[in-house]
């Protein structure tokens, strides 16, 4: 039965991968996973579908999930990320495992997005059971090393701390309603909207000054001194010192030059509690790496454990890379006797070559023409 026009398309935001594209993705994914393994991270996998009771969104995230019902009427969700799924798995299947626990993954995730892409290939890590600044620095350094290994392009890592934002808001005493609007615009880097919002509320001069400077406060470690001029509140001082320590450890890891401190980073998921970071590459208008500390999440699953991690949007990086022909056949085998063609192809494959065999009898001229069309450099006649 002929397909309708809808049957010839794919759902909005989903994608096919052609051979060259898939080869490039698999190569990048393997490079990342090999690196994670070298840092003692073990690969895990979770179901594509989770119960909605596991993936509990905050209000602003709920509409971004793909939902359906099973035959018992339970709400199911296509996983929008792996962090929560891994928290469920660790808290149930791996309870009692010695901490710190280092896990990694490669998987597709699904969520509605303003970029019109709804299916994302991710690689990432979770470091569970350590509250130290060294753990925060480790995952940032590992994200940087992964980008260096798989991307082959310039990138920038921005590092911040959720406690600095909440501490400044508490010091200024701004209304909760204003804070939510301000936070939303800050996360979008909507500087014009921030200026209009601050002026509309008519705060005193000192408060306005801090609120307008905060979005532009980024750079190296000395930038943190400006924050301490605004307040010495204990919670704020603790957050500043924690961020400062992470940044210094990154120098020990040899990756500090890739990192800029940015106090305007506010992660989109509600569970981030400490150091947070984002990574950008040229040509992509959103972060290709997102991560940070989420110490409260495991408590929701009955396992009180601090944790940190990151995810790399592999699809976004692949789109900026040039597809290679690395996975295309190297040899085309032809001949008049199919049995001999099969035997010759088997022999060549045993040497490690990628071999395509002609399924019909071809002349040498026809075989050469076919190889040229397919980009195959070597042609062998089976005799």
UniProtKB/Swiss-Prot annotation:
One MF term in the entry's GO annotations: histidine-tRNA ligase activity
Main location: cytoplasm
PROSITE patterns per UniProt: AA_TRNA_LIGASE_II
GO cellular component, one term: cytoplasm
Annotated GO biological process: histidyl-tRNA aminoacylation; L-histidine biosynthetic process
CDD domains on file: HisRS-like_core
Residue ranges of the TM segments: none
Locations listed in the record: Cytoplasm
Pathway given in the UniProt record: Amino-acid biosynthesis; L-histidine biosynthesis; L-histidine from 5-phospho-alpha-D-ribose 1-diphosphate: step 1/9
Taxonomic superkingdom: Bacteria
Keyword line: Amino-acid biosynthesis, Cytoplasm, Histidine biosynthesis
HAMAP family per UniProt: HisZ (MF_00125)
Physiological role: Required for the first step of histidine biosynthesis. May allow the feedback regulation of ATP phosphoribosyltransferase activity by histidine.
Miscellaneous notes: This function is generally fulfilled by the C-terminal part of HisG, which is missing in some bacteria such as this one.
Family label: Belongs to the class-II aminoacyl-tRNA synthetase family. HisZ subfamily.
Subunit structure: Heteromultimer composed of HisG and HisZ subunits.
Protein name in the entry: ATP phosphoribosyltransferase regulatory subunit
Organism (species): Desulfitobacterium hafniense (strain Y51)
Gene designation per UniProt: hisZ
